């Protein structure tokens, strides 16, 4: 399942310059994936679309994929949107433009589910975790204390609060999630 990301309080909600549209032709991109923003498209129909690549190193000035989680169900050549209400089944399809935002250190709060983290490196698995740092492979790992003079995208674990995910019935499913404060980008 894909990560669920909620923009709890982010500057990109008020500053348009922190929002862009990206496209990655090689693979699907989950929301919350750290991205390197490349060059602007030369296609006249997509002049505000930037090529992106998933982060593959500890780096700053990264963007996070974040599109409305409307799941697309494909049947042959037909595409149906909104039949599946579970945002964990959503992904940004390869080769199609998607939204992204640039986290601002000291301001932004995001909420993410367990799938945001590298396998076995979520805050529940890492006892005493207080920070989350991007790794050389672009994944995020919870760590007990911040790395001294860390040079990449980093978050402080602010709180653990569940996200209620609709499942097509009355009520919903409570899913573990963490609110993260951006401390470095």
PLM segments and residue spans:
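Surface-exposed, low-hydrophobicity beta-strand/loop segments enriched in small/polar/acidic residues
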Residues: 1-185
